[in-house]
A protein has these predicted regions:
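Alpha-helical structural context detector biased toward long hydrophobic helices
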Residues: 1-7, 11-307
């Protein structure tokens, strides 16, 4: 079993399958990778992309593959029939109709929050930026509870002691996916205004995705990312492609979209603005950890230099 979970996907394989092309039992996907400033394009099976070897392995649980099993069971499984049902409903519905139920939002919010929390960028940010701040405060609090004589002798040793990086990563995963915390993050999204975009340019300019597919933007800001914009910020917009032809955008009810929440929440909107589609695609590629994914027929056009 452990061998089966050596190549640990940082984005669900079943999610990537929707952006690829079936080839027998495999699904082939177009890949863009930037290595030391050099851009390379290739095709490969979705089994072989979007993963990091042993990335989620832990030492604080009986099963070192605990998190990979958790993601496969609790999160990635949602990319199967649940996602299929949502996409089918959107595809078969008329424009301007309500296509997302409360259950659909629950499913998608779990996928989005888990994706935001499991990517290396989020884990590394917590380790390198947030953890040092918390660590310093925890040490100060600890020192304040100790006898003065002990502090005088050992203060420098206490303040210089750090948890190993592996422990820090385990701390991040345990905190992010603790049920009460995870449910609270999901509720923030569920309470937002959900707009379902049907891409009218799917055949020539489909939605792209990457191994970091959830785009968190701030209205009026150029920086992207969860920690630069915040999950509950009224100016935050979350954009998530479900397939080459369908994406959801989530806006805060406390922001400017709140005024039209009843009109747009859960509604299918035909998206004909090529500039908007290309902008989202560019940002999703730019924030990729390693791999961006380009559906057909756009992949062949890019590879051949015709676009």
């Amino acid at each position: 079993m452990a061998k089966d979970y050596t190549n640990q996907h940082i984005v669900p394989k079943r999610y990537l399958d929707r952006f690829g092309t079936k080839d027998g039992k495999r699904t082939i996907i177009g890949v863009r990778i930037v290595n030391k400033g050099n851009v390379r394009f290739f095709t490969d099976s979705t089994v072989n992309v979007g993963y990091i070897k042993n990335y989620y392995d832990v030492t604080d649980k009986n099963d070192p593959k605990y998190w990979e099993h958790y993601f496969a069971r609790e999160i990635d499984a949602l990319c199967g029939q649940d996602m299929e049902n949502i996409i089918a409903k959107v595809t078969l519905s008329c424009p301007d109709t309500i296509v997302l139920s409360a259950h659909d939002k629950e499913v998608l919010s779990k996928l989005i929050i888990a994706q935001l929390m499991r990517i290396p960028e989020s884990i590394d940010y917590v380790k390198t930026v947030l953890y040092p701040r918390v660590s310093a405060q925890v040490k100060e609090d600890l020192v304040s509870t100790l006898p003065p004589a002990f502090v005088e002798k050992h203060r420098e040793q206490i303040m210089n002691t750090e948890f190993p990086e592996q422990y820090q990563k385990e701390l991040v995963l345990n905190h992010s996916f603790e049920p009460a915390n995870f449910d609270r993050y999901c509720k923030v999204l569920q309470d937002g205004v959900w707009v379902v975009y049907a891409n009218m340019h799917r055949d020539t300019m489909p939605f792209l995705t990457s191994d970091n597919p959830v785009l968190v933007e701030g209205i009026g800001k150029t920086e992207t990312g969860l920690f630069r914009n915040g999950l509950a910020n009224p100016a935050t917009c979350i954009f998530y492609p479900l397939s080459p032809g369908i994406a959801v955008a989530i806006y805060s009810r406390q922001g400017i979209w709140g005024a039209v929440a009843d009109e747009y929440d859960g509604r299918k909107v035909l998206l004909d603005e090529l500039k908007y589609i290309m902008s989202r695609n560019i940002n999703i590629m730019a924030q990729a950890h390693r791999h961006s994914f380009i559906p057909q027929p756009l992949y062949d056009a890019v590879k051949n230099g015709s676009v």
